[in-house]
Each structure stands twice: as C-alpha cells, then as structure tokens.
Curated annotation (Swiss-Prot):
It is found in: Plastid, Chloroplast. Belongs to the universal ribosomal protein uS11 family. It comes from Platanus occidentalis (Sycamore). This is Small ribosomal subunit protein uS11c. One of its GO terms (molecular function) is rRNA binding. Its main location: plastid. The lineage of its organism: Eukaryota, Viridiplantae, Streptophyta, Embryophyta, Tracheophyta. Residues 1-23 are annotated as: Disordered.
Length: 138
C-alpha cells in the first residue's frame, strides 16, 4: 500500500504551497465589472490566474452605496494596491457592464501609476438575441 504524502504544516500554521503574494508580476490584466448594484475589480496575470480582487461590498459599502462611483474608486484602489507592491508596472484594462463605477474605477487605476497598454470595453451586447424583460412600472 502506498504511503500517504506527509503534509508539513496545517491550517493553524499557515497555508502550504506557493502564496499568491510570493510571485513577481510585471504585467497583468485588470478586469472591472460594473453593474448598477456593485463594482468588482479583479487583477489577473497574463495567463488569467487571479492575483488580487476587491469589490465595493468587500470594502464595507452596503446597500445602494455599493453602486456609487466612490465605492468603485475605493474597490479599484484596494485591488491595485496589492499588485503594485508585487511589482506590477504594466496592465491591460477590460471594462464590463453599464454601472456608474466604470469611469471612477478607471480613474483610480490611472492614478495608481500603472502604465496602461490599452483599455477595452468588453460589455456583452446581444445581436438581437433573447427578449429583454418587460419594463418596470413604478
């Protein structure tokens, strides 16, 4: 019978394997998903592995305040602060969604000092696909 692999360390001692903050990442991709209710900022390396992420809800905003531009700016700042410490200098930005946080998140990314190679809008647009839901009557 094969011997089980002995694992050194435990949950209390700390995680086993390579930590995400151990890598040096010179170039990455910043994904901004801005909905009307929240803004999610995810930073990945060029292969698509997540390095850092933040959202307006994770930054402490609750309810309707999560959809505000200020919340998006805070979320973008938090996500980017960690990758700048890991040595990221260049990035591509992919913005998705119709939310209010689009411009505010992009402004926060520009202010961070990361050189942006391009900014692309990847909002999914139907070529007359599914029928949209009926209009709200308030």
């Amino acid at each position: 019978m094969a011997k089980p692999i002995q694992r050194i360390g435990s949950r209390r001692n700390g995680p086993i394997g390579s930590r995400k903050n151990g890598r040096r990442i010179p170039k990455g991709v910043i994904h901004v998903q801005a909905s009307f209710n929240n803004t999610i900022v995810t930073v990945t390396d060029v292969r698509g592995r997540v390095v850092s992420w933040s959202s307006a809800g994770a930054c402490g905003f609750r309810g309707t305040r999560r959809g505000t531009p200020f919340a998006a700016q805070t979320a973008a700042g938090n996500a980017i602060r960690t990758v700048v410490d890991q040595g990221m200098q260049r990035a591509e930005v992919m913005i998705k969604g119709p939310g209010l946080g689009r411009d505010a998140a992009l402004r926060a990314i520009r202010r961070s000092g990361i050189l942006l190679s391009f900014v692309r809008d990847v909002t999914p647009m139907p070529h007359n696909g599914c029928r949209p839901p009926k209009k709200r009557r308030v």
